Amino acid sequence: MANHEQIIEAIKEMSVLELNDLVKAIEEEFGVTAAAPVAVAGAAGGADAAAEKTEFDVELTSAGSSKIKVVKAVKEATGLGLKDAKELVDGAPKVIKEALPKEEAEKLKEQLEEVGATVELK
């Protein structure tokens, strides 16, 4: 069995993609998540802090009049192929991306709205 130093050295040599895969494998193997715990700010603000949503789904509700630009923006944002991005846009309302942090979700919403799409954060 490898000692701690050998494990740390092996991790240092990994690429970001390999580290991401390692984290996912550890999460699956041990039934845990690598998400940082959210601290609740005392009893008075506790209910508000717990109720605040931290992850959002970006839903395309309509492609609007410039469908081609929306398809290109969806393709770029999701990494899908052109055909898959077009099918996603044609099937609106559809969730484009799930469980994004608030800033990322708002940025994607802005990008899609700039090209004429109607978008909701859920």
Swiss-Prot record:
<keyword id="KW-0687">Ribonucleoprotein</keyword>
<dbReference type="GO" id="GO:0003729">
    <property type="term" value="F:mRNA binding"/>
</dbReference>
<dbReference type="InterPro" id="IPR008932">
    <property type="entry name" value="Ribosomal_bL12_oligo"/>
</dbReference>
<comment type="function">
    <text>Forms part of the ribosomal stalk which helps the ribosome interact with GTP-bound translation factors. Is thus essential for accurate translation.</text>
</comment>
<comment type="subunit">
    <text>Homodimer. Part of the ribosomal stalk of the 50S ribosomal subunit. Forms a multimeric L10(L12)X complex, where L10 forms an elongated spine to which 2 to 4 L12 dimers bind in a sequential fashion. Binds GTP-bound translation factors.</text>
</comment>
<dbReference type="GO" id="GO:0003735">
    <property type="term" value="F:structural constituent of ribosome"/>
</dbReference>
<dbReference type="InterPro" id="IPR013823">
    <property type="entry name" value="Ribosomal_bL12_C"/>
</dbReference>
<dbReference type="InterPro" id="IPR000206">
    <property type="entry name" value="Ribosomal_bL12"/>
</dbReference>
<dbReference type="GO" id="GO:0006412">
    <property type="term" value="P:translation"/>
</dbReference>
<comment type="similarity">
    <text>Belongs to the bacterial ribosomal protein bL12 family.</text>
</comment>
<protein>
    <recommendedName>
        <fullName>Large ribosomal subunit protein bL12</fullName>
    </recommendedName>
</protein>
<dbReference type="InterPro" id="IPR014719">
    <property type="entry name" value="Ribosomal_bL12_C/ClpS-like"/>
</dbReference>
<dbReference type="Pfam" id="PF16320">
    <property type="entry name" value="Ribosomal_L12_N"/>
</dbReference>
<dbReference type="GO" id="GO:0022625">
    <property type="term" value="C:cytosolic large ribosomal subunit"/>
</dbReference>
<dbReference type="Pfam" id="PF00542">
    <property type="entry name" value="Ribosomal_L12"/>
</dbReference>
<keyword id="KW-0689">Ribosomal protein</keyword>
<dbReference type="InterPro" id="IPR036235">
    <property type="entry name" value="Ribosomal_bL12_oligo_N_sf"/>
</dbReference>
